[in-house]
Amino acid sequence: MKQSYKKNKKRFVMLIGLLFLMISVMTVNDSALSSRLLPVLPDHLLVFPNDYGAHPDFRLEWWYITGWLETDDKKKFGFQVTFFRYATDLNFGNPSRFAAKDVVIAHLALSDPAVGRLMHREKTAREGFDLAYSKQGNTGVKLDDWFLVREENGTYQVDMRSEDFGLQLSLRPTQKPM
């Protein structure tokens, strides 16, 4: 069990490192995007529910949900669901549907504190062809068969399953947005 935990922990650290490296490399050449992407400013007024969705005028955004789950037999698990949308420096003016303008990255993690085990999976794809997207307006992000959607009543639907574990959740917020 410890070997599996160490292997998963190493993969998780490598994923986070790869994500930061990718963002660092992609931000080195900002000149192509500087005229179209907006800076993030502290006084930007948010208007909900429209601002729950994607903002293609900004470089990077993410939808992040964490929490604790309890089974019927009182076993507890921690979970994390994250979707990222990243505007690339590539093909902005290219009208082709094949042009990679945005990348969607998704990460799913489930922790079992009773045995010190962390399971996680990740996926990455460019937006397009209904395989990966981040919708403007209300939350709607998808990568392959994984998705996070906010319904009109405010409930979030999550479906992220892999070959060995996964989550299907219906979540109702109990607090206002931060």
What are these regions (language model features)?
Residues 2-13, 22-178:
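Targeting-peptide/extracellular-domain and disordered-appendage signature
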